[in-house]
Amino acid sequence: MTPIPIPPRDQTPADSLVTLDGFKKLFGFVPNVFAVIAQSPHALAAFKGLQIPLEKTLNAGMRDRIALAVSEVNGCEYSVRAHSYIGVRLSKLDAAELEMSRYGGSNDPRTEAAVSFAKRVTETRGKIKETDLKVIRDAGWTDAQIIEIVCRTAQILYVNFVNNVFHTEIDFPLPEAIADEA
């Protein structure tokens, strides 16, 4: 299947342009995933509607780690590459630590509990066991924070599905290349 065509700026809905300009300012370019989603201003607003509140509760590194765990489960190479890049370049995380996050791991027990939980939620489609909740609670996460982790998981599921359905052309470097540059 061929990737969905990325429309030029002059063919992008006007209601999406301000958000895309924000992504361009942040990344230095408009990532293809957002150019794809921007074809529906409502879908782009839905993504942003989750992103802004979560930025206040989960730090950038945690959001990237969760994104990597969820994306690995979903086989979304675009998001794995994007969040590996973002994690190293913007969140200033160690590339090896990010690689561990892809599989639900971390050198920090509290972080590992959150990332592993997001992975488990994705694998089970939310039908986790009581022991899964016990592990994350025992690591110091409150129920409100656990809900925020579930929300981030759902946000990344949405982006993974867009990428997997439309075969979004990857415009981020391989994780190995990022690690070599860091």
Language-model features: locations:
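Hydrophobic alpha-helical segments
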Residues: 1-182
